[in-house]
Amino acid sequence: MFGLSPAQLIILLVVILLIFGTKKLRNAGSDLGAAVKGFKKAMKEDEKVKDAEFKSIDNETASAKKENIKEKEQA
């Protein structure tokens, strides 16, 4: 991974822990997790809106087709 050996990664993690401390890293992890959760929630809501729009368009198209068929039958 990134040209680093496992030993180098462990040393890097230890240095990061020493610099930032576990409390700051825990808070940063919590903040990152909350941001990801919010992003996923927004994506789901956006999908629901799109689905509702597609359903309304499908309903409009179906009703327009029915009206068109009725007009052709009456003609």
Curated annotation (Swiss-Prot):
It is a single-pass membrane protein. Keywords: Cell inner membrane, Cell membrane, Membrane, Protein transport, Translocation, Transmembrane, Transmembrane helix, Transport. Its main location: membrane. GO terms for molecular function: protein transmembrane transporter activity. It comes from the Bacteria. InterPro entries: TatA/B/E, TatA/E. The keyword ATP-binding does not apply. The chain crosses the membrane at residues 1-21. It is found in: Cell inner membrane. GO terms for biological process: protein transport by the Tat complex. GO terms for cellular component: TAT protein transport complex. Gene3D superfamilies: 1.20.5.3310. Part of the twin-arginine translocation (Tat) system that transports large folded proteins containing a characteristic twin-arginine motif in their signal peptide across membranes. TatA could form the protein-conducting channel of the Tat system. The Tat system comprises two distinct complexes: a TatABC complex, containing multiple copies of TatA, TatB and TatC subunits, and a separate TatA complex, containing only TatA subunits. Substrates initially bind to the TatABC complex, which probably triggers association of the separate TatA complex to form the active translocon. HAMAP family: TatA_E (MF_00236). Belongs to the TatA/E family. This is Sec-independent protein translocase protein TatA. It comes from Haemophilus influenzae (strain PittEE).
